[in-house]
Amino acid sequence: MSGTINPPDGGGSGARNPPVVRQRVLAPPKAGLLKDIKSVVEETFFHDAPLRDFKGQTPAKKALLGIQAVFPIIGWAREYTLRKFRGDLIAGLTIASLCIPQDIGYAKLANVDPKYGLYSSFVPPLIYAGMGSSRDIAIGPVAVVSLLVGTLCQAVIDPKKNPEDYLRLVFTATFFAGIFQAGLGFLRLGFLIDFLSHAAVVGFMGGAAITIALQQLKGFLGIKTFTKKTDIVSVMHSVFKNAEHGWNWQTIVIGASFLTFLLVTKFIGKRNRKLFWVPAIAPLISVIISTFFVFIFRADKQGVQIVKHIDQGINPISVHKIFFSGKYFTEGIRIGGIAGMVALTEAVAIARTFAAMKDYQIDGNKEMIALGTMNVVGSMTSCYIATGSFSRSAVNFMAGVETAVSNIVMAIVVALTLEFITPLFKYTPNAILAAIIISAVLGLIDIDAAILIWRIDKLDFLACMGAFLGVIFISVEIGLLIAVVISFAKILLQVTRPRTTVLGKLPNSNVYRNTLQYPDAAQIPGILIIRVDSAIYFSNSNYVRERASRWVREEQENAKEYGMPAIRFVIIEMSPVTDIDTSGIHSIEELLKSLEKQEIQLILANPGPVVIEKLYASKFVEEIGEKNIFLTVGDAVAVCSTEVAEQQT
């Protein structure tokens, strides 16, 4: 398939372009079955080449690198300096002041005592500091996961009627969430979390934020009896049903005053990044001031609900409380899988965001192992599911964090709080915790992101709104299910209905582009050029064949109507076709036979190495003929247009 071709000139002046040497489309050297399998496995599970640092090292060095891979702290601790510690100390103290009041509030979302929220900001951050690869992420309970755990566990066991078994179910869910997370990382299946699209996450988080805020109306208004459901209709019905006698005006004044204070401090922090510490310490200041006034004026005697007693002391061992059998065992696995997935998605997204801002890399699979390990250990030390908190991580970042030591500092402060300070929270009003949670979750509602999604991709926006509406009108778990289903539906739609376009030639060039994108791109008389923007698999092969056949029919009808030359060649531009399977080849064979019956020749242009190798292996190249496979669309058009011109004369 060599020689020269003389493409016709594009200007009609009679001048001829210089001869162009036609290049043959080559198949790559055969690699062999084992090599192919090895290549696929490496690209799927080891695309980041995790073993590259082990090459050429002594056994002792390999052992050290292996330990360092599991515990990254060993690597960066050798280069740790006093300057870095100063930054980590300031950041750790700052996020500790934020996490303590948040943890007490988030524990209520999970329907557990406040101490368990504090426990979950002690052990998990210590584990993560040794095993995690993110320098900026701050670990602890978060609002969405706390609500998810509380909602799912409450549907199985009533926390008021059977608090002991409820707590055991929470620990069981935490254990299996950790197993699920660590298992994904160990098996290098981290890519699975990418199936939950960004749009679906935006919608789910926004819906969860509104649901959480509505749940806080119980403490914010001083309502004693409140619905266990999370949908907006049930919550608002419960709120207004108690409006006449169930609301407490002192509680409302406390909540509204401090919510205003918290929102003002957040506004100040956004306007001036140097004042990042103002919104960070505002929750703790709010707790201190409100607790002081409730104690002085004994507002609890006037109906203001308070936290009451919080046990002193650090985390007790809880491994004996995990259900490893019985009727709640499978429920623990189910809840742990769901909550673990959400926690993992949030943490990895946060870690990637701040890593990109500081221009360093994180290992997603190591992150999953670290997060999973800390939750497994946490379940054995009276913690519930912890993950990366966006609000704390943002404060951590702005405070000048250098390494994960900030998590250690935060954990130490929380431990000291558990040992010595928890009795002081006895008179903390529930309204202030509600105000803190409301101010925190408002940041999860990303209206700008939703507007951007609408502008870019309407199908993505459907996923976003489906998850959002599912959460606020039905339940958190249904909203998550909708998010996953729509994300998968979009993937299936893109796979089964790939984009296919007609190409035309741009004026005064040898460049061929989409005629819809470039209206001045002219189609060549007698030639139809089609580009398939996807791999051709069993799932879309029939669609590709039928779409190409439909275009041929439409072009034939147009040619007949306008007196243009009939289609004699169909060129398929295959450079975007990264792969093809047996069904794909079979569909092209059927298209070839169908076109031959209409006296139309099928031409392939620029098939990639994987595709051309399979075309040779299937004997399709012999069927279509090597002379009908070209390196470029330009080469194919040059030959085909000459033949069309000859047929016309």
Curated annotation (Swiss-Prot):
Induction: In roots by sulfate starvation or after selenate treatment. Residues 1-20 are annotated as: Disordered. GO terms for biological process: sulfate transmembrane transport. Belongs to the SLC26A/SulP transporter (TC 2.A.53) family. Keywords: Membrane, Sulfate transport, Symport, Transmembrane, Transmembrane helix, Transport. Expressed in lateral root cap, root hairs, epidermal and cortical cells of roots. Residues 517-640 form the STAS domain. InterPro entries: S04_transporter_CS, SLC26A/SulP_dom, SLC26A/SulP_fam, STAS_dom, STAS_dom_sf. It is a multi-pass membrane protein. The gene is SULTR1;1. Interacts with OASA1 through its STAS domain. Residues 1-86, 133-136, 270-275, 356-367, 426-431, 487-649 are cytoplasmic. Signal peptide: none annotated. GO terms for molecular function: secondary active sulfate transmembrane transporter activity; sulfate transmembrane transporter activity; symporter activity. Residues 108-111, 158-168, 211-248, 297-334, 389-404, 453-465 are extracellular. The chain crosses the membrane at residues 87-107, 112-132, 137-157, 169-189, 190-210, 249-269, 276-296, 335-355, 368-388, 405-425, 432-452, 466-486. This is Sulfate transporter 1.1. The keyword Transmembrane helix applies. Pfam families: STAS, Sulfate_transp.
